[in-house]
Amino acid sequence: MKRKSFLPLVVLAFAACGLKNLCADDFAAVTAPVGRVGAALITPVNQLVTPAGAQLELPGGRPQALALSADGKLLVTAGITHELVAVDPATGKILQHVPLPSGKTLEPVPAVDAILDADEKAQMSYAGLKFSPDGTRLYLANVSGDVKVFSVAKDKTFSPLFSIAVPPVNLAKRTNDLPTGIAVAADGKKIYVALNLSNRLLEIEAATGKILRTWNVGVAPLEVLLAGHKIYVSNWGGRRPVAGSVTGPAGQGTRARVDARSIASEGSVSVIDLAAGQVSAMTKEIVIGPHAGALALSPNGRWLVAASAGSDLLSVVDTRSDEVVETFTARQNPGDLFGAQPVALAFDAAGKILFCANGSQNAVAVFQFAPRETKLLGLIPAGWFPCALAFEAHTKKICVANLKGLGAQTEKAKLDAPGFGFNTHQHAGSLSFIALPSKGELKTMTATALANLRYPLLAQAKLPPRPDRAPVPVPERAGEPSVFKHVIYILKENRTYDQILGDVTTGNGDPTLCNFGERVTPNQHKLVREFALLDNTYCSGLLSADGHNWADSAIATDYVERGFAGWARSYPCGGFGENGRDALAYSPAGFIWDNALAHGKTVHDFGEFTTSEKHWKNPTVKTKITFAEVWKDFAGGENAIAHTAEPDIETLRPFIETDWSSWDLDVPDVWRAAKFIQRLKAYEQQDNLPALTIFWLPNDHTSGTKAGSPKPAAQVADNDLAFGQIVEAVSHSTFWKDTCIFAIEDDPQNGWDHVSAFRTTAYVISPFTRRNAVIGTQYNQTSLLRTVELMLGLPPMNQFDATATPMFDCFTNPPDFTAFNAVTNNVPLDEMNPAAKKIKNAQLRQDALASARLPLAQPDQCDENVLNHILWRATMGAQPYPAWAVKLVDDD
């Protein structure tokens, strides 16, 4: 049943009223779907986005940075679209799209050569976009390992000139360094470039690309700022480790200082005196909070402000002494939970107003700047995750780059078109142009921004437990009793609601997008009939790198949000081994297991954030272990293959299942289910099922149509049967009476959905779950985490789970203890993809060849657009690929 969307009037009213008349009850349960309604966006992270000012949408963009020319007449941005976008800040109109110059030459070449040989793989790095002081040059840090140089003509048109290579690095998976922040000398003759992987700063002759000097700085330098004869460099990971430092992996084999949870513990600002000749050491290093990033210099050059996105703090440095003289918070109140994530700074022309982009709050904080007495004046609503700022003094406009703009859904008007749907790869960043507000206007904007964040719920989330409360499925306050003693939290891989449950007539599904319906997934269909069907639940992330972070920590850090620029340091979702382990990626507020352990709860992890390998127990056997070998070993009970897992986050080591397979699509999920059921029996014998069990069940990702792997339908059927077997085992165990099972996808990127790119399948299974119910309340991954926290007596970790809607509507009391019985699969689990040469259909044969080349050994390394086309054709036959999703792809 396909339902049209509507937005409750109360939600839109939040944007037009003050907070004084709002209480937490006004935010209780939203039933609207995620997506755009007019100029507003309902996000899958509990927030409403209603940006102030004029908006310029950048389809496919994710703009990472802004550069404003000295005369204020040109604004430039860049993101993941392999180009510059030049804009007139006065009108908000695009002036020019500029290709990035070739990276093949290190010397200046005629502009025409650079244009004809444009670098179509280059894209904006984490940071680094600067005009020369005279406005005739523009420099862009390219994530692939060079600096792109552009000329700017008198008529304000750009031309790509040449690229400046930076020295290589010798890392396990990368030889190109990663340029980030850029500063340009006052005379334009030198540029200063931070190298994010080698932890260095380069001084480069602008005309020739010659490296003049090199300095060591801190870990993962991001921004560079020139102040007189000194250079300031912000370092995401703080000081370089020394002997005795407690360290953890920080991507690409690098290390950073960490805390007891293996999460990055500090940031820093390196100070370099340019007048010190050839000395390569920094002059000083100022330690601030983790994820040090944005820098801004007051117009008089006296005060440097540095933002720590990992602590929500801003530090004011006196450039005469290089001492911190003030630290203040970007949050509305200092006692608020983590979650502002200040990621960009800008001063007004007089230096009396400081603007700060609070990425996680979709707002620009406005401060009255007075060192030692800085005061928050209010918040201006921006787009989704503002990450760059510029203040245009002539028109008094605040220019904001919004990383996620107004969401992935750029074609909402086509909702009723046949076969219409959304996919998370429909990126859409934006720029906002906001007139400097008056005092009264700022007050109204502040009320809007806080209402958009459901801010009153932060206070409610911190209320103490009340005495003498009877146990309920989901307590209203952390610490109040729950009927549940155990939670099992299962993460699956990459499916949308419509792909699996689009054929369920009682829910809001589109059967034309359902390629793994009841024939393939009979257990999931039986579960939603016997328990509850959730048809308005969403993943919070786009893909595995941010998806697993949202699913486990209820937030994605600034580091992860910027990482979409090529994932140059790591792909931090687990399953990658050393090169995916990255303490800089993780939330300073920790993961759900950190929360549980800190409050005395027992935890066990079956695969999440672990990396595994398999080998023959008999070392003389040299046969390659394929799916066929694993299936034979499992189905035949041979037990000749050993599986071992290592934690990707060191603090998980005592709590992981070591005889385990995490991400390995050659290992069937029914193997994982069987191993878990063995462990469950041991738990029963010892009566010690952990309070929190985390489980990664990944095979619904599929291997495409790769020969030697099961067909897509077989792998999804395998995942379905394993899920059903786990539920069956738990529901027939002694723990059933006080156990709740949650299951959700990590992200929905490998599919299509007619409601939202983020909508997914979710399951709430327990004796207290409402039976035979359709739940239309809007939930997301943070809702699941908030509900888990309330069940286990845990406080929220950050502002996102604190303001999430608990899943009260999914439960009832008294309970129904009827157990679940799994049903057998309809699709053989070992139904294999044929060899390409045996496929008669030319397109399907091409798909098989393409699948063979997809890098499926680790999560999300293949082109998802190609894989989605392959899955569609493999499962939907001759039905045309959805028109909304068509784009030119190279299926070869």
Residue locations for each model-derived region?
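Generic N-terminal leader/processing signal
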Residues: 2, 18-19, 233, 620, ...
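Intrinsically disordered low-complexity regions specifically enriched for long asparagine
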Residues: 5-6, 23, 625-626
